[in-house]
Amino acid sequence: MRLLENLWGKKPSRKSDKKKKGSSNYAYAVTRVRAMKSKLLPKESYPRLLNMGIDEITRFIQESEYKNDVDELAMKYSGGDLAEHALNRNLALTYDKLVRITSGELNYLIVAYLKRYDIWNIKTLLRGKIYNASVEDILESLIAAGEFTYTSMSELAAKATYQEIVEALKHTEYYPLLQKFDGTNLAYIENELDKIYYADLFEAIGKPRSKDRKLFAQVVRLEVDVKNLINLFRLKKAGVMQPDEIMPLMIEGGLELKIEKLAALPYDEFVNELQRTQYWEAISGVVGPDMISLTTLESRLTRYYLESSTILSHVSPITVVPILDYIIHKNNEATNLRIIFRGKETGLSDELIKDQLVII
């Protein structure tokens, strides 16, 4: 644990000033980020990776942007564990770099967006404790890309119980909600944490008047729609049909979906209503009464979201959106690699692994 703390080093300050609108360095930051995006793995890499074993895949990423992460962690980990830690470390350091190279309002928006990783980490810590995961297993899934440092999260992971973790977070905005966690209501807590995150993010965006903030808001609202739509499918397929059971699980602020109307519809009518939305073309080929797994549906919607963020990043190139687009695609790359490593490690067929990937 101490080794990782030393390797990851100190996080840059996440304090930013939204009032410093004149000091934003959009042109410089976007130029840097476009260069970073050009180094993401090309889509042609994934068929090759699917034909490799774990050691070969590790060597492959060791020759890419993940080289330093793999090299520095190889003394402590191997196989899928090495990959997991290296991917998470790389994400954290990459996003910290974005915080360092941005300033003013641009920095403020990026910091607000990256707080999603604090939510991820709180969920991971709570889930780990109630399922009696080892400290190492918990650390493997933490991503120090938000405001929480890796050192502070390591200390939380070492706590004996979830109650101790909750108490250690008493000075955060999440504490009033976390006090309601009793060890049996994790799904409720996780959903409410997501709501807090998006409410805070929309507050940071404010009432979007500039083209920059309007585009930023559009990407976030599109993501909310995708999350709600996946959740609606999951609930409908599970036989949950009552709006009063569905609505508390929805996130406010979506772009197009009329959630209250969709929540009240039986499955067939729900699907028919979706044909009027922008999302239908992306999912029409996999939606049907006999649909059992939602994996392909989720992949299609995620792909649509990624493609849309890229399109919006070209609408106004010198804005926050190209940086947001890079964050989204970088996370998707890490997710794809994680799926491949874990799939290979557990013996899944290449076809099953491929179904879970979102390749752009």
Swiss-Prot record:
Q: Name one Pfam family in it.
A: vATP-synt_AC39
Coiled-coil annotation reads none
Q: Which UniProt keywords apply?
A: ATP synthesis, Cell membrane, Hydrogen ion transport, Ion transport, Membrane, Transport
User: Could you tell me the membrane topology recorded for this protein?
Assistant: Peripheral membrane protein
pH dependence remark = Optimum pH is 5.2 for ATP hydrolysis.
What InterPro entries does the entry give?
A: ATPase_csu/dsu_sf, ATPase_V0-cplx_csu, ATPase_V0-cplx_csu/dsu, V-ATPase_V0D/AC39_subunit, V-type_ATPase_csu/dsu, V-type_ATPase_csu/dsu_dom_3
Example of a GO biological process term = proton motive force-driven plasma membrane ATP synthesis
Write out the annotated subcellular location: Cell membrane
Q: Name one GO molecular function term.
A: ATP binding
GO annotation, cellular component aspect: plasma membrane; proton-transporting V-type ATPase, V0 domain
Other noteworthy facts: This organism has both a Na(+)-translocating F1F0 ATP synthase and this H(+)-translocating A1A0 ATP synthase.
Q: What does this protein do?
A: Component of the A-type ATP synthase that produces ATP from ADP in the presence of a proton gradient across the membrane.
* Assembly: Has multiple subunits, A(3), B(3), C, D, E, F, G, I and K(x); there may be a few other subunits as well.
Membership in a protein family: Belongs to the V-ATPase V0D/AC39 subunit family.
Q: What is this protein called?
A: A-type ATP synthase subunit C
Q: Which organism is it from?
A: Methanosarcina mazei (strain ATCC BAA-159 / DSM 3647 / Goe1 / Go1 / JCM 11833 / OCM 88)
| Lineage, broadest ranks | Archaea, Methanobacteriati, Methanobacteriota, Stenosarchaea group, Methanomicrobia
